[in-house]
């Protein structure tokens, strides 16, 4: 059975995509969000759910998880006209009668207009590259931290030397039984102040060492084998949980197949966020224009303009004057 055509399909379920979907709901149109990950929220939800964000208007500070929760709650007001598709990667889209055919790795979708809000593309964690690593992943081997209290009373080993690794180590110092950081260099790449705090903390620092093997039973890792760089010294670290903080790699390989105009790895847009294809718009980190500032707050400001332009494109004969939300919601 042919999928019904939604008014607007938003590619990307990060903060900008979620707010665009909310605003589209506010304007009374039907919306579909297609997200490649297994959950909504994008980088704030996946990469730094418990880190503080300080540049969201009206919030002195909030975590990535709180930002995501608020956006999803805001969108839930229009759940009757919003459809969410998770773990679907958009491969191509083509102009068809009445709109666009959007093909993903799972299905074919139809939409009258498209708003691209996929950031810098799909992203995946950089792994240890060790045999059996995949077997332990998401059991007691993690590439990001959603809840600090899940590590309470545990022996935690963290691999990495960047901001995330150092921040997680400091955050877990008073929660875990012990925290050990393994880094391949003596120098850390994290913020200087955080590194100083780390060096004066109770966190065990093992540098310069590299992971060589994982040992465990079933789906649970029990030991990490590490070797000192350029030496034969080998250590076995007992652990309850292992956090691999090597960062994430992004890929916009599919974005390049969408037959749009690009500037480096982003999509070139007009001042109204129109791409080189009529009816397709781009916002957030996916969009490129002169003077662009890559902030979440910037994307929030871009979303209403793109939605309004999409509605004007879909319904050119409708009275599309923008009304303030105070007049639309009781």
Curated annotation (Swiss-Prot):
User: Which transformation does this protein catalyse, written as a reaction?
Assistant: 2 reduced [2Fe-2S]-[ferredoxin] + NADP(+) + H(+) = 2 oxidized [2Fe-2S]-[ferredoxin] + NADPH
Highest rank taxon of the organism: Bacteria
Q: What is the E.C. number?
A: 1.18.1.2
Query: Does this entry carry the keyword Membrane?
Result: no
Entries under Gene3D superfamilies matching the protein = FAD/NAD(P)-binding domain (3.50.50.60)
The kind of enzyme this is, by top-level EC class, is oxidoreductase
Q: Keywords for this entry? A: FAD, Flavoprotein, NADP, Oxidoreductase
InterPro entries named in the record? FAD/NAD-bd_sf, FAD/NAD-binding_dom, Fd--NADP_Rdtase_type_2, Ferredoxin-NADP_redctase_2
Query: What does the cofactor field's note say?
Result: Binds 1 FAD per subunit.
Q: Which GO terms describe its molecular function?
A: ferredoxin-NADP+ reductase activity; flavin adenine dinucleotide binding; NADP binding
Q: Which cofactors does this protein require? A: FAD
Binding residue positions for FAD? 35, 43, 48, 90, 123, 285, 326
- Assembly and oligomerization: Homodimer.
Q: Which family does it belong to?
A: Belongs to the ferredoxin--NADP reductase type 2 family.
Which PANTHER family is this protein grouped with? THIOREDOXIN REDUCTASE 1-RELATED-RELATED
Q: What is this protein called?
A: Ferredoxin--NADP reductase
Which species does this protein come from? Streptococcus pyogenes serotype M49 (strain NZ131)
């Amino acid at each position: 059975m042919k999928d019904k055509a939604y008014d607007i399909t938003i590619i990307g379920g990060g903060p900008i995509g979620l707010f665009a979907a909310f605003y589209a709901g506010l304007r009374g149109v039907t919306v579909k969000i297609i997200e490649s990950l297994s959950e909504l929220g994008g980088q704030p939800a996946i990469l730094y759910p418990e880190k503080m964000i300080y540049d969201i208007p009206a919030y002195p500070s909030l975590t990535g998880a709180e930002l995501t929760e608020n956006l999803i709650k805001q969108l839930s007001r229009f759940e009757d006209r919003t459809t969410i598709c998770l773990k679907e990667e958009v491969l191509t889209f083509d102009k068809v009668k009445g709109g666009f055919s959007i093909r993903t790795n799972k299905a074919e979708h139809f939409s009258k207009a498209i708003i691209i809000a996929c950031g810098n593309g799909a992203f995946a964690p950089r792994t240890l590259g060790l045999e059996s690593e995949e077997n332990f992943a998401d059991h007691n081997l993690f590439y990001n931290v959603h809840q600090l209290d899940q590590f309470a009373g545990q022996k935690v080993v963290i691999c990495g030397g960047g901001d995330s690794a150092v921040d997680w180590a400091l955050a877990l110092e008073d929660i875990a039984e012990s925290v050990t950081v393994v880094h391949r260099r003596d120098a850390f790449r994290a913020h200087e102040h955080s590194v100083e705090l780390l060096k004066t903390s109770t966190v065990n620092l093992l540098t310069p060492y590299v992971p060589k093997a994982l040992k465990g039973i079933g789906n649970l890792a029990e030991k990490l084998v590490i070797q000192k760089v350029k030496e034969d010294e080998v250590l076995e670290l007992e652990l309850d949980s292992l956090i691999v903080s090597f960062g994430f790699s992004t890929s916009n390989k599919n974005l390049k197949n969408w037959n749009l105009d690009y500037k480096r790895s982003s999509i070139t847009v007009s001042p109204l966020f129109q791409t080189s294809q009529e009816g397709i718009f781009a916002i957030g980190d996916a969009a490129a224009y002169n003077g662009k500032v890559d902030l979440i707050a910037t994307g929030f400001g871009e979303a209403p303009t793109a939605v309004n332009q999409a509605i004007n494109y879909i319904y050119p004969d409708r009275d599309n004057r923008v009304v303030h939300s105070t007049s639309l919601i009781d």
